[in-house]
Amino acid sequence: MAELNVNIGNLPLKNPVMTASGTFGYGIEYADFMDISRLGGIFVKGTTIQPREGNDYPRMAETPSGMLNAVGLQNKGADYFAEHIYPKIKDINTNMIVNVSGSSVETYVECAEKIAELDRIPAIELNISCPNVKQGGMAFGVTTCGAGEVVKAVRRVYPKILIVKLSPNVTDITEIAKAVEAEGADSVSLINTMLGMAIDAEKRKPILSTITGGLSGPCVKPVALRMVWQTYHAVKIPIIGLGGISNWKDAVEFMLAGASAIQIGTYNFVDPTVSIKVIDGLNDYCDRHGFKSVKELIGALDIQR
C-alpha cells in the first residue's frame, strides 16, 4: 500500500483528496452514509462577514458535460458559522477549511480575522473571484493588482495556512499566481468556475436570473489541467487542482500536471461518495505502477516524444 499523505505548505493531509467549497455543504450532512474522516480535507461552503441571501432563482442550469451556477454565495455569515456550525465540525478528524469571500478588501480581512479565532480551522481559502464593489464590480482575481491587494491585506491578519482560489477568467493565470505568491499565499487552488451562459431558445431569454454564471464539471477539465500545468512551472508554492474531476484517473492527471492535492466539486452532486472511491483508486494506481508515495506523481508528466 502506497503512502498517500501530502502537504500543503505546513498543513499535512492524510491524502490528497478533498471536497470543493459549495459542493459538499459543511461535511456533516454526509457523515451518516460515508466516513468523511477519510478525506484529506473538506472545504466548507463560502462564508462572508455578513449574511447573504444569494441571487434570485433560477440560479442553476444543466449544460452539456457540466452545469452553470449563480447561487451568489448564500450563507448566514461568519458569526453564525462560528457560533452554530463550527461546534458541530471542529472534532471531525480531517482538515476543515473555510472558503472566505468578500466585496471589499476590508470585508475579506474582517472575515479572515473571525475565522482565525477558531482553533480547529487550520486554513482558509480566499475566493478572489468576487466582484470588488469599490472598483465597479471587477473581480479581485482578474488583475495582478487586485489579487495581490486582497492577499496582502489578509496575510497581515491571518497567521495560518492561506490558500488562494484562482479565477480562470484571465489572460494569463500564471501572472495572478505569481502575484499572490509574492504577497504571502501558502498555496493556490485552481480553477474556479469559468464564466458561461445558457439561453432558452423558445422564450428567447437567459435561463439564469443573473444572465451569466459559473461553469463547472467535466467540460472544464482540459482548461483546468492546462492551467495547473502552467502554474506548476511558474510558482514554488503547492497547487490544489480542481475542475471536472470525477474519478481517480482525473485525480492522477491533475497530480501529474503539478497538483499536490485535488478537490472534487460538481461530481459530488452525482455521487456524494466519489471522493472515497478516488482515494482508493489513487492507492491502487500507485501500487500498480510501483510508486511508494503518491507524492511521486506530483509534476511527473513526461512531455518527451
UniProtKB/Swiss-Prot annotation:
Give the note describing cofactor binding and stoichiometry.
Binds 1 FMN per subunit.
Catalytic activity of the protein: (S)-dihydroorotate + NAD(+) = orotate + NADH + H(+)
Report the active site residues: C130
| Localization, UniProt | Cytoplasm
Q: In which pathway does it act?
A: Pyrimidine metabolism; UMP biosynthesis via de novo pathway; orotate from (S)-dihydroorotate (NAD(+) route): step 1/1
Q: Does the keyword Flavoprotein apply?
A: yes
Indicate where this protein is primarily found.
cytoplasm
Q: Which GO terms describe its cellular component?
A: cytoplasm
Q: Which GO terms describe its molecular function?
A: dihydroorotate dehydrogenase (NAD+) activity
What residues bind FMN, as annotated?
S21, K45, G46, N99, N127, K165, I191, G217, G243, G244, G265, T266
Membrane spanning stretches: none
Which BP terms does GO give this entry?
A: 'de novo' pyrimidine nucleobase biosynthetic process; 'de novo' UMP biosynthetic process
What quaternary arrangement does the UniProt entry report? Heterotetramer of 2 PyrK and 2 PyrD type B subunits.
The protein depicted here goes by the name Dihydroorotate dehydrogenase B (NAD(+)), catalytic subunit
The organism of origin for this protein: Parabacteroides distasonis (strain ATCC 8503 / DSM 20701 / CIP 104284 / JCM 5825 / NCTC 11152)
Q: Which gene encodes it?
A: pyrD
